[in-house]
Amino acid sequence: MNRRRRIYEGKAKILYEGPEPGTLIQFFKDDATAFNKKKHDVIDGKGVLNNRISEYIFTHLNKIGIPTHFIRRLNMREQLIKEVEIIPLEIVVRNVAAGSLAKRLGIEEGTVLPRSIIEFYYKADALDDPMVSEEHITAFGWASPQELDDIMALAIRINDFLSGLFLGVGIQLVDFKVECGRLYEGDMMRIVLADEISPDSCRLWDIETKEKMDKDRFRRDMGGLVEAYQEVARRLGIINENEPPRGSGPVLVK
């Protein structure tokens, strides 16, 4: 991979040029970040698990007709993806009050919301990814009204699928974050799901115990992040029931 041109490096992934025009290679790092990189560790094995879990979810989404950038997994840390023009928004779908929503509105964490809520955040680390409205999005040209309709329709379908998928293995989907992009195919353009879906980008609670099985374990210094991600992968049937934990836990990066 060192011989390939690096296109972009984010908090948890690196994009390299792909083997064919219109493709990229997405590499999953072991970096764990929170609060827009104010907190940063490297946790051995996290990237491998996120790659496997995201592959599993994107493959199933493709099968049910939800368009994504995913082509196939190449190895333990890399995926082949379609090159898209990323829309500078984080789309958050919330089913249960947690995190910033609970704090912002004074709702007790764990309260089931009257209905699923979609929120938008402008992707700008320097501004701490501010929450924005549909009016902001269309006024500043980040997405057109039609694109916004497409994004919201995708988000609702993804939420329906993920909620059922996780419910079937005893996990409650509290909320999740996705990103979308414009995929150009000849003269045609369509909105597709991009980035990843993994315990890094979802809040996942055990239905019975309410044990957190996501990146909140890192945000809140609870420990056991890799073990929690492994348990998600085991329940989904992605890794063997008896596969031993990878790595030796978090390593602080100075």
From Swiss-Prot:
Recite the UniProt keywords alphabetically.
Answer: ATP-binding, Ligase, Nucleotide-binding, Purine biosynthesis
Q: Might you give the EC number(s) for this enzyme? A: 6.3.2.6
Pathway field of the UniProt record reads: Purine metabolism; IMP biosynthesis via de novo pathway; 5-amino-1-(5-phospho-D-ribosyl)imidazole-4-carboxamide from 5-amino-1-(5-phospho-D-ribosyl)imidazole-4-carboxylate: step 1/2
Q: Which InterPro entries is this protein grouped with? A: SAICAR_synt/ADE2_N, SAICAR_synt_PurC, SAICAR_synth, SAICAR_synthetase, SAICAR_synthetase_CS
Which reaction(s) does the protein catalyse, per the Swiss-Prot or TrEMBL entry?
5-amino-1-(5-phospho-D-ribosyl)imidazole-4-carboxylate + L-aspartate + ATP = (2S)-2-[5-amino-1-(5-phospho-beta-D-ribosyl)imidazole-4-carboxamido]succinate + ADP + phosphate + 2 H(+)
Signal peptide span per the entry? none
Q: What class of enzyme is it?
A: ligase
**SUPFAM superfamilies under this entry?**
SAICAR synthase-like
Q: GO annotations under biological process?
A: 'de novo' IMP biosynthetic process; cobalamin biosynthetic process
- Record-level Gene Ontology MF annotations: ATP binding; phosphoribosylaminoimidazolesuccinocarboxamide synthase activity
Supply one GO CC term from the record.
Answer: cytosol
Quote the NCBIfam families the UniProt record gives.
Answer: purC
Family of the protein in this entry: Belongs to the SAICAR synthetase family.
Report what the protein is called.
Phosphoribosylaminoimidazole-succinocarboxamide synthase
